[in-house]
Amino acid sequence: MLANLDRYKIVLASNSPRRKELMTGLGVDYVVKTLPDVDESYPDTLQGEEIPLFIAREKAAAYQSMIGPEELLITADTIVWHEGKALGKPVGRQDAIEMLRSLSGKSHQVITGVCVTTREWQKCFAAVTDVRFAILDEDEIAYYVDHYQPMDKAGSYGVQEWIGFVGVESISGSYFNVMGLPIQKLYRELKQL
Protein backbone atom coordinates (compact mmCIF):
# COMPACT_ATOMS: atom_id res chain seq x y z
CA MET A 1 0.00 0.00 0.00
CA LEU A 2 2.90 2.35 0.59
CA ALA A 3 4.75 1.74 -2.69
CA ASN A 4 6.02 5.33 -2.56
CA LEU A 5 8.26 4.21 0.32
CA ASP A 6 10.03 1.54 -1.73
CA ARG A 7 12.96 3.90 -2.24
CA TYR A 8 13.54 4.08 1.54
CA LYS A 9 14.78 1.70 4.16
CA ILE A 10 12.48 2.47 7.11
CA VAL A 11 14.18 2.70 10.49
CA LEU A 12 12.18 2.72 13.72
CA ALA A 13 14.25 4.30 16.47
CA SER A 14 12.47 2.83 19.46
CA ASN A 15 12.83 0.17 22.14
CA SER A 16 9.06 0.07 22.63
CA PRO A 17 7.55 -3.35 21.95
CA ARG A 18 4.20 -1.64 21.35
CA ARG A 19 5.62 0.64 18.64
CA LYS A 20 7.24 -2.39 17.00
CA GLU A 21 3.91 -4.25 17.12
CA LEU A 22 2.09 -1.31 15.54
CA MET A 23 4.70 -0.85 12.79
CA THR A 24 4.50 -4.57 12.01
CA GLY A 25 0.71 -4.25 11.82
CA LEU A 26 1.12 -1.47 9.28
CA GLY A 27 2.63 -4.02 6.92
CA VAL A 28 5.82 -2.18 6.02
CA ASP A 29 9.32 -3.58 6.18
CA TYR A 30 11.43 -1.83 8.78
CA VAL A 31 14.47 -2.28 10.97
CA VAL A 32 14.98 -1.15 14.53
CA LYS A 33 17.94 0.96 15.61
CA THR A 34 18.39 2.10 19.17
CA LEU A 35 20.90 4.16 21.07
CA PRO A 36 21.57 3.40 24.74
CA ASP A 37 20.98 6.79 26.33
CA VAL A 38 18.95 9.32 24.36
CA ASP A 39 18.24 12.38 26.48
CA GLU A 40 14.49 12.72 27.05
CA SER A 41 14.62 15.89 29.13
CA TYR A 42 12.88 19.04 27.93
CA PRO A 43 12.67 22.72 28.89
CA ASP A 44 10.24 23.41 31.75
CA THR A 45 8.54 26.08 29.65
CA LEU A 46 7.08 23.53 27.21
CA GLN A 47 3.43 22.53 27.52
CA GLY A 48 1.23 19.75 26.16
CA GLU A 49 2.00 18.82 22.54
CA GLU A 50 5.26 20.78 22.62
CA ILE A 51 6.86 18.23 24.98
CA PRO A 52 6.64 15.01 22.95
CA LEU A 53 7.35 16.92 19.73
CA PHE A 54 10.52 18.37 21.29
CA ILE A 55 11.65 14.94 22.50
CA ALA A 56 10.85 13.25 19.15
CA ARG A 57 12.98 15.91 17.40
CA GLU A 58 15.79 15.42 19.92
CA LYS A 59 15.67 11.67 19.33
CA ALA A 60 15.88 12.27 15.57
CA ALA A 61 18.86 14.59 16.09
CA ALA A 62 20.62 11.91 18.16
CA TYR A 63 20.30 9.49 15.24
CA GLN A 64 21.10 12.04 12.51
CA SER A 65 24.66 10.83 11.91
CA MET A 66 23.39 7.23 11.63
CA ILE A 67 20.83 7.93 8.89
CA GLY A 68 21.92 6.45 5.57
CA PRO A 69 21.18 8.17 2.24
CA GLU A 70 18.19 5.90 1.54
CA GLU A 71 16.87 5.69 5.10
CA LEU A 72 13.70 7.12 6.57
CA LEU A 73 13.87 7.42 10.35
CA ILE A 74 10.79 7.35 12.60
CA THR A 75 11.09 8.66 16.14
CA ALA A 76 8.33 9.17 18.68
CA ASP A 77 7.65 10.13 22.25
CA THR A 78 4.46 9.78 24.28
CA ILE A 79 3.35 11.60 27.40
CA VAL A 80 0.25 11.69 29.52
CA TRP A 81 -0.88 15.30 30.02
CA HIS A 82 -2.89 15.62 33.21
CA GLU A 83 -3.90 18.68 35.20
CA GLY A 84 -1.35 20.89 33.48
CA LYS A 85 1.66 18.62 33.79
CA ALA A 86 3.34 15.80 31.91
CA LEU A 87 3.38 12.31 33.33
CA GLY A 88 6.19 10.31 31.83
CA LYS A 89 7.40 6.86 32.81
CA PRO A 90 7.34 6.19 36.56
CA VAL A 91 10.62 6.01 38.44
CA GLY A 92 9.44 3.25 40.77
CA ARG A 93 6.48 1.38 42.24
CA GLN A 94 5.30 4.22 44.47
CA ASP A 95 5.53 6.73 41.62
CA ALA A 96 3.41 4.41 39.44
CA ILE A 97 0.81 4.09 42.20
CA GLU A 98 0.67 7.87 42.69
CA MET A 99 0.25 8.46 38.95
CA LEU A 100 -2.62 5.99 38.74
CA ARG A 101 -4.27 7.53 41.82
CA SER A 102 -4.08 10.93 40.14
CA LEU A 103 -5.70 9.56 36.95
CA SER A 104 -8.44 7.67 38.80
CA GLY A 105 -11.92 9.03 38.07
CA LYS A 106 -10.57 11.77 35.80
CA SER A 107 -9.81 12.59 32.19
CA HIS A 108 -6.36 13.13 30.72
CA GLN A 109 -4.73 13.40 27.33
CA VAL A 110 -2.25 11.03 25.78
CA ILE A 111 -0.02 12.97 23.40
CA THR A 112 2.49 11.46 21.01
CA GLY A 113 4.97 13.46 18.98
CA VAL A 114 6.29 11.73 15.86
CA CYS A 115 9.09 12.77 13.50
CA VAL A 116 9.75 11.26 10.10
CA THR A 117 13.30 12.20 9.10
CA THR A 118 15.67 11.68 6.19
CA ARG A 119 19.02 13.32 5.49
CA GLU A 120 17.21 16.02 3.50
CA TRP A 121 14.02 16.77 5.39
CA GLN A 122 11.98 16.24 8.52
CA LYS A 123 8.22 16.17 9.09
CA CYS A 124 6.85 16.15 12.62
CA PHE A 125 3.31 15.95 13.94
CA ALA A 126 1.45 15.28 17.17
CA ALA A 127 -1.63 13.23 17.98
CA VAL A 128 -3.85 13.83 21.01
CA THR A 129 -6.26 11.30 22.50
CA ASP A 130 -8.61 12.04 25.39
CA VAL A 131 -8.92 9.21 27.92
CA ARG A 132 -11.26 8.98 30.91
CA PHE A 133 -10.54 6.60 33.77
CA ALA A 134 -13.15 5.11 36.08
CA ILE A 135 -12.53 5.43 39.81
CA LEU A 136 -9.88 2.86 40.68
CA ASP A 137 -9.64 1.54 44.22
CA GLU A 138 -6.31 0.97 45.98
CA ASP A 139 -6.46 -2.80 45.46
CA GLU A 140 -6.97 -2.39 41.70
CA ILE A 141 -4.08 0.04 41.44
CA ALA A 142 -1.75 -2.18 43.49
CA TYR A 143 -2.80 -5.28 41.55
CA TYR A 144 -2.00 -3.62 38.24
CA VAL A 145 1.34 -2.20 39.36
CA ASP A 146 2.40 -5.54 40.87
CA HIS A 147 1.23 -7.85 38.07
CA TYR A 148 1.81 -5.84 34.89
CA GLN A 149 4.52 -3.59 33.46
CA PRO A 150 3.74 0.06 34.15
CA MET A 151 7.37 1.12 34.50
CA ASP A 152 8.02 1.52 30.76
CA LYS A 153 4.82 3.42 30.03
CA ALA A 154 3.91 7.09 30.15
CA GLY A 155 1.36 7.66 32.90
CA SER A 156 2.12 4.21 34.35
CA TYR A 157 -0.40 2.28 32.28
CA GLY A 158 -0.89 0.33 29.10
CA VAL A 159 -4.38 0.66 27.65
CA GLN A 160 -3.98 -2.81 26.11
CA GLU A 161 -3.40 -4.37 29.55
CA TRP A 162 -5.73 -5.26 32.44
CA ILE A 163 -5.98 -1.65 33.63
CA GLY A 164 -7.34 -0.64 30.23
CA PHE A 165 -9.96 -3.37 30.36
CA VAL A 166 -11.27 -2.42 33.81
CA GLY A 167 -10.27 1.20 34.19
CA VAL A 168 -10.74 3.06 30.91
CA GLU A 169 -14.29 4.40 30.63
CA SER A 170 -13.88 6.20 27.33
CA ILE A 171 -11.41 7.15 24.63
CA SER A 172 -11.83 9.98 22.15
CA GLY A 173 -9.22 9.80 19.43
CA SER A 174 -6.73 7.14 18.38
CA TYR A 175 -6.58 4.03 20.56
CA PHE A 176 -3.21 3.23 19.00
CA ASN A 177 -1.91 6.63 20.06
CA VAL A 178 -2.60 5.58 23.65
CA MET A 179 -0.48 2.48 22.95
CA GLY A 180 2.38 4.75 21.87
CA LEU A 181 2.12 5.43 18.13
CA PRO A 182 -0.74 7.08 16.22
CA ILE A 183 -0.40 4.54 13.45
CA GLN A 184 -3.31 5.75 11.30
CA LYS A 185 -1.96 9.30 11.28
CA LEU A 186 1.56 8.00 10.58
CA TYR A 187 0.20 5.93 7.68
CA ARG A 188 -1.50 9.03 6.21
CA GLU A 189 1.70 11.06 6.58
CA LEU A 190 3.81 8.33 4.95
CA LYS A 191 1.30 7.96 2.12
CA GLN A 192 1.73 11.66 1.26
CA LEU A 193 5.52 11.44 0.89
Swiss-Prot record:
The record marks 18, 78, 160 as: Important for substrate specificity. It is found in: Cytoplasm. The keyword Hydrolase applies. It catalyses: dTTP + H2O = dTMP + diphosphate + H(+); UTP + H2O = UMP + diphosphate + H(+). It comes from the Bacteria. Belongs to the Maf family. YhdE subfamily. The active site is at residue 77. It holds the Pfam family Maf. CDD domains: Maf. Its main location: cytoplasm. InterPro entries: ITPase-like_fam, Maf-like. SUPFAM superfamilies: ITPase-like. GO terms for molecular function: dTTP diphosphatase activity; UTP diphosphatase activity. It comes from Bacteroides fragilis (strain YCH46). This is dTTP/UTP pyrophosphatase. The keyword Glycosyltransferase does not apply. Its cofactor is a divalent metal cation. Transmembrane segments: none annotated. GO terms for biological process: nucleotide metabolic process. Nucleoside triphosphate pyrophosphatase that hydrolyzes dTTP and UTP. May have a dual role in cell division arrest and in preventing the incorporation of modified nucleotides into cellular nucleic acids. Its EC number is 3.6.1.9. GO terms for cellular component: cytoplasm.
